[in-house]
């Protein structure tokens, strides 16, 4: 693995290897490679709290040097292309680029670069490190993916998390279902759409998605009713009470309390939302460690 662009390019062996590596970092049973002479640049063209901060901590724990880059003060504001920006960073010595961009599959225009790229989210396309940290969180609970019933609820069409998790969970043997308003369904994903109330008592993992108003048409935003959405697709206390004893709740965050999930359930006993955030730092350590070790081995 010399880049991480999409979950569809990861095989199951690579997924398990990354989970095991991240778990070893988390448990103090592994030491990262020696990367004090390596440089990383984080290019975030969309707002981010968890992902950006998580990558920053992961990079610092690995000993990488950070190239200061802020999109608001970069030459992108003067019209420089994404390719030229990344090529510049490659030429001045960056060893890996972490990129979040509003353009889906932005990385297609970077294929001629000779530098590893980690996709931190591309429009409504993919979010591979979020999927990996979700998989790590699930694996900590069940030690398997085979046969698990996963319900992904919400704005499926506009969610890169839904697409990445659908691909990876299906490949690992889980049964994925969606629950979504008609206008937010993604028919390209070959999983059944179900009524949340008809399946809630047999679900192992409830994965809630943020309503992504920033990707909606104006008419969708103005017609959106919080109470109606929460009643039809949100995790309410009554639905929580029907969950299996070992079922867990997940959400990629940021969480809109009272919309996707009842406020009091965000830190309920079955919730793993904040554990996901913790695991994110370790999975990103594992991804960067693996990519740079692969790059080093290739260079020898």
From Swiss-Prot:
A single GO cellular-component term on record: cytosol
Quaternary context: Heterododecamer (2C3:3R2) of six catalytic PyrB chains organized as two trimers (C3), and six regulatory PyrI chains organized as three dimers (R2).
Pathway: Pyrimidine metabolism; UMP biosynthesis via de novo pathway; (S)-dihydroorotate from bicarbonate: step 2/3
Cysteine pairings via disulfide bonds: none
Residues the record lists as binding L-aspartate: 78, 160, 210
A GO BP entry: 'de novo' UMP biosynthetic process
Record key words, sorted: Pyrimidine biosynthesis, Transferase
Annotated PANTHER family: ASPARTATE CARBAMOYLTRANSFERASE, ORNITHINE CARBAMOYLTRANSFERASE, MITOCHONDRIAL
Gene assigned in the entry: pyrB
Enzyme class, spelled out: transferase
Protein name as annotated: Aspartate carbamoyltransferase catalytic subunit
GO MF assignments: amino acid binding; aspartate carbamoyltransferase activity
Gene3D superfamilies the record matches: Aspartate/ornithine carbamoyltransferase (3.40.50.1370)
Domain of life per record: Bacteria
Catalytic activity: carbamoyl phosphate + L-aspartate = N-carbamoyl-L-aspartate + phosphate + H(+)
Role description: Catalyzes the condensation of carbamoyl phosphate and aspartate to form carbamoyl aspartate and inorganic phosphate, the committed step in the de novo pyrimidine nucleotide biosynthesis pathway.
Family: Belongs to the aspartate/ornithine carbamoyltransferase superfamily. ATCase family.
Residues that, per the record, bind carbamoyl phosphate: 50-51, 100, 127, 130, 253-254
Enzyme Commission (EC) number: 2.1.3.2
């Amino acid at each position: 693995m010399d880049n991480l662009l999409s979950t569809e390019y990861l095989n199951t062996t690579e997924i398990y290897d990354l989970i095991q590596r991240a778990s070893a970092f988390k448990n103090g049973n592994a030491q990262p490679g020696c990367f004090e002479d390596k440089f990383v640049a984080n290019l975030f063209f969309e707002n981010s709290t968890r992902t950006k901060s998580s990558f920053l901590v992961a990079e610092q724990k690995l000993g990488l040097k950070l190239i200061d880059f802020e999109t608001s003060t970069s030459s992108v504001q003067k019209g420089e292309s994404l390719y030229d920006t990344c090529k510049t960073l490659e030429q001045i010595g960056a060893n890996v680029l972490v990129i979040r961009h509003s353009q889906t599959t932005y990385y297609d225009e970077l294929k001629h670069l000779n530098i590893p790229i980690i996709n931190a989210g591309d429009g409504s396309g993919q979010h591979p490190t979020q999927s990996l940290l979700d998989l790590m969180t699930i694996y900590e609970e069940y030690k398997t993916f085979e046969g698990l019933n996963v319900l992904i609820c919400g704005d499926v069409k506009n969610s890169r998390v839904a697409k990445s998790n659908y691909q990876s969970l299906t490949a690992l043997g889980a049964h994925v279902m969606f629950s979504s308003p008609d206008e937010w369904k993604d028919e390209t994903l070959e999983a059944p759409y179900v009524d949340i109330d008809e399946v809630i008592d047999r679900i192992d993992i409830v994965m809630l998605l943020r309503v992504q108003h920033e990707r909606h048409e104006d008419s969708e935003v103005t017609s959106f009713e919080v109470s109606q959405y929460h009643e039809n697709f949100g995790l309410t206390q009554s639905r929580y009470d029907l969950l299996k004893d070992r079922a867990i709740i997940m959400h990629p965050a940021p969480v809109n309390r009272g919309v996707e999930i009842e406020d009091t359930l965000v830190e309920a006993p079955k919730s793993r939302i904040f554990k996901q955030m913790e695991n994110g730092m370790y999975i990103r350590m594992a991804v960067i460690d693996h990519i740079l070790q692969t790059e080093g081995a290739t260079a020898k």
